[in-house]
Regions:
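C-terminal regulatory or interaction extensions
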Residues: 1-208
Length: 208
C-alpha cells in the first residue's frame, strides 16, 4: 500500500509532506491506512445557536468504509498495481485495482447508491464481518453517502472506475478555496462598511 500526503491540489507539486509504503496483514493495513488519513486531517468548530459543534475534514465513518472497501474488493490477481491513498489539500483519493460490478465505466459519478453490492472476495469480506470491521446487512457505500448528507452537493463523494481500477474521492468538508476566502473576507468588509455608514458621523470622523 502506498500512502502519500501532497502539498497542493494535485501531484504536480514537488513537495510530498508524507510518504509511506506499508506491508502487513489486511487488518494491520486497514488500521495503518485509516490512521494515516486521520492523522493528516483537520478538525474545527462550527458555530451553532448556543454553542459549537465539532467537525472534521472527513466523516470518520466514510474513511473507514472507503478503506475497508478497497481492501475487501481489490482484485488481488492483478499484479503490478497497489492500493493507493493520496491526500491533497481539498480531498483524499483511494484507488484500488479492480473494476466495479460488471466492469461499468463511471466518471465523476456521485450516485453511490446505484453501485451493486458485489463481493469480489467472499472470504475477506466474511473475515472483516466477523471482526466487526464491516456489516453484511448494510452496504459500505450507503454508509459513506449517509455520512455526507449534511454537506453541499459539491462536497459529495465521487466515484471513477473502468475495467482495471476503482477510485473513490472524499472531499474535505473544511477546505476553503482561495475564491471562497476572498468572498468570505469581502462580505465581512462589506458589512463593516455598511455598519460604518449607517451611523451619522462628522467630517472629522469620516476623515479618520
Amino acid at each position: 500500500i502506498h500512502l502519500r500526503y501532497w502539498k497542493g491540489l494535485d501531484k504536480s507539486s514537488d513537495t510530498r509532506l508524507d510518504n509511506k509504503e506499508m506491508v502487513g496483514n489486511l487488518i494491520t493495513q486497514r488500521k495503518n491506512r485509516i490512521d494515516f488519513i486521520l492523522r493528516h486531517s483537520e478538525t474545527g468548530i462550527k458555530k451553532t445557536l448556543y454553542s459549537g459543534k465539532r467537525i472534521a475534514s472527513y466523516p470518520e465513518l466514510a474513511i473507514r468504509e472507503a478503506v475497508t472497501n478497497a481492501l475487501a474488493h481489490r482484485n488481488y490477481f492483478r499484479h503490478g498495481m497497489e492500493i493507493g491513498v493520496d491526500i491533497f489539500d481539498d480531498r483524499v483519493e483511494i484507488l484500488s485495482p479492480g473494476s466495479a460490478y460488471g466492469g461499468k465505466i463511471r466518471k465523476g459519478d456521485k450516485d453511490l447508491l446505484s453501485l451493486y453490492p458485489w463481493r469480489r472476495n467472499q472470504i475477506i469480506c466474511n473475515v472483516f464481518s466477523l471482526l466487526h470491521r464491516r456489516e453484511k446487512s448494510r452496504p459500505g457505500f450507503e454508509k459513506i453517502r449517509a455520512s455526507y448528507h449534511l454537506y453541499s452537493s459539491d462536497r459529495q463523494p465521487v466515484i471513477d472506475c473502468d475495467e482495471t481500477v476503482f477510485k473513490i474521492t472524499l472531499f474535505d468538508c473544511l477546505y476553503e478555496s482561495p475564491r471562497d476566502k476572498i468572498k468570505k473576507n469581502g462580505n465581512q468588509n462589506y458589512q463593516k462598511i455598511i455598519a460604518f455608514c449607517s451611523v451619522p458621523k462628522s467630517a472629522a470622523e469620516i476623515a479618520n
